[in-house]
Amino acid sequence: MAQNRVSRLMQEDRKFLIAYYMPEFPLPGSTLPVLEALQKSGVDIIELGMPYSDPIGDGPVIQDAAHTAIGNGVHIAGILDLVRKARAGEGCEKITVPLLLMGYCSPLIAYGGDCFLSDASEAGVDGLLIPDLPPEEAEDFLFRARGFGLSVIFFISPETPPERIGMIDGLSTDFSYCFAVNATTGTAKLAGADSERDIESYLRRVREHTKKKFVVGFGIKDRARVEKMWNLADGAVVGTALLQAIRNASTPEEVALMTAEFWKTLKS
């Protein structure tokens, strides 16, 4: 397939800082200002959550953000429209960084598989992360997604055996996404020597059995954790901490300001 933005980015020999954001959280009208603030603050990739009423792997902060987004009228078609506007520079500066969508199978099936892939590609989406899509059952989806120029990123956990790590690495288009711990999103306790040793051992094992890049998410909230993950992986994903930083904003403009202020703490 022709290279999209994320494929081109992953050819660069450096570490990456990735944001996860739930559209229209905490307020309607927040998404485009947040995307602009993140891009101006030097984000490498933005993951946009597709809210679902029954998320199986999300911690309480992201669950609450999803429920808020749904209450604010967010749905897949609306997210794709926001991506179109972002790419065109309607309501914000033109967004040129890679945009990924992260969500669960059920809403995508309800939307219509090929219709979703076509609409996502046309809107300017670069790739997809679907936590409940088993790699072993994804061959047809992968083929179709790549036909629309979309990357597909699969997940690795601390319990993934070495041979399966290699299989996931082979299937993921550009990089794999590692859960930093066996816990729901953002709820992990990363303190303590034992936990640190476990994480380091796990990520060294991933490095040993992968050829492509991999990034780490779940529980990363400050510059120290970003640098720790950069020493072990190719990128760090910050989501829960970002949502916590902006959840008390009272206007979309304040959401954007809080986003920029928080992201600055991760960059320096």
From Swiss-Prot:
Gene3D superfamilies reported in the protein's UniProt record: Aldolase class I (3.20.20.70)
Record keywords, A-Z: Amino-acid biosynthesis, Aromatic amino acid biosynthesis, Lyase, Tryptophan biosynthesis
Active site, UniProt feature: 47, 58
Gene Ontology MF, one: tryptophan synthase activity
Catalytic activity: (1S,2R)-1-C-(indol-3-yl)glycerol 3-phosphate + L-serine = D-glyceraldehyde 3-phosphate + L-tryptophan + H2O
Protein task: The alpha subunit is responsible for the aldol cleavage of indoleglycerol phosphate to indole and glyceraldehyde 3-phosphate.
Enzyme Commission code: 4.2.1.20
Pathway(s) the chain acts in: Amino-acid biosynthesis; L-tryptophan biosynthesis; L-tryptophan from chorismate: step 5/5
Protein name per its UniProtKB record: Tryptophan synthase alpha chain
Family: Belongs to the TrpA family.
First and last residue of the signal peptide: none
Top-rank lineage group of the source organism: Bacteria
Subunit structure: Tetramer of two alpha and two beta chains.
GO cellular component annotations of the record: cytosol
InterPro entries, per the entry: Aldolase_TIM, RibuloseP-bd_barrel, Trp_synthase_alpha_AS, Trp_synthase_suA
HAMAP family hit by this protein: Trp_synth_alpha
